[in-house]
Amino acid sequence: MKSNRSRLLFLVVSIAALASLRAVDSGPGKDPATKALSVFSEVFSLTRGNYVDPTDPKTLLEGAYDGMTDALDPFSYYVPAASMSAFRAQQASGAVGPGIIVARRGGFPYVVAPLPGSPAQKQQVQPGDLIHAVDGKNLRNAPLWKITSALEGPEGTTVEVGLFRVVEDKKVTVRLRRERFTPPPLETRWENDLVIVKIPVFTASTAEALRKAIDEAGRRSIDRLVLDLRGSIGGDVADVAPSATLFVGRGPIARIVSRKVPLKPLEATGERVWKGRTVLLTDEATGGPAEVFVAALKDRANATTVGTATAGMAIVQRLVPTGSGGSLFMTVGRYQSPSGTILGGKGLSPDERVITFPGDTESHDPILERGLEVARRGVARRAA
């Protein structure tokens, strides 16, 4: 019955979408949005009256709402009115999760990335893992808010997460502890001719730690710097400005494109300190504040990016209540680089793309190896 219901929801949304497009394209007359709503109403009525099994109007409508938010981006979702009390109660309860950023694409929930230092990262939950179950409950087609709620719970408890690892074509089950955690600190590794700095997440102390590494590089007469931002996700975008300032000096770091919400641009206010060659390592788990940092250094410090495309999470989201009592959690703004590149959505493509494989280990790190090669050869960044 659940399978039939899933197919039914898919058919309702798909038929409504196709019919809406047909109505929009047909001749003059009504406003396209009015036409689309009229067609949707007709499809809804026809489905209720003619589908082989009795249908629940609430189920049909909630499926349509989920389809609508899925069409926006992987991070937006709708919470129905009947679930808002439980949703608010969980938010206010102090519930914690295992440190997984979750999104939905094509109706399937997946791991964007584990948060740095989290139980999920320690248990090697990987970006791109599909989530099919939480504590034995099938959540393959569940809306995003239900998955997030299922992952969270009282601090100190555990949660079992069923994953499908696409790159290895296998199912993986992990038991994760729900706990508060501290992101790991910035790491510095020195070589004879360059310095490698790993930035796990941007915090209030990141700029100071970066400044110390830059000052030490000056004392060692090193003018090549590799910044490893792979897996750097989460944190506060306000902490990006002091760090980016060290590389770009005064001026714009990012602005926010939004239709309705007035948001201030991000500006660097200090002096540029580092003037050597900079290489940035990125992957699919480089997201949010880290993407803003990478884009600013690409545009204004001629930094070269090496690795894979970033997460596309440089966005601003808001919970917007609806008149029916539900709420839309949706993207209301996207960060834009100084040159005008939109960061939220597709993510940033690297200047030097590196293909990676599941068997890659710390002893064979193709992205780092290529980054060191670029830094040492002085390969100039290709135009975007």
Q: How would you describe each model-predicted region?
A:
Residues 7-22:
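Hydrophobic membrane-insertion alpha-helices, especially the h-region
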Residues 322-334, 349:
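Short acidic, Pro/Gly- and aromatic-enriched capping/linker segments at domain boundaries
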Residues 25-36, 48-52, 56-57, 110-113, ...:
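Cleft-lining beta-strand/loop regions that shape enzyme active-site pockets
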Residues 55-72:
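An acidic helix/loop motif centered on a single conserved Asp/Glu
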Residues 343-346, 360-384:
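Conserved functional hotspot residues or short segments at active or partner-binding sites
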Residues 63, 74-113:
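PDZ/PDZ-like peptide-tail recognition elements
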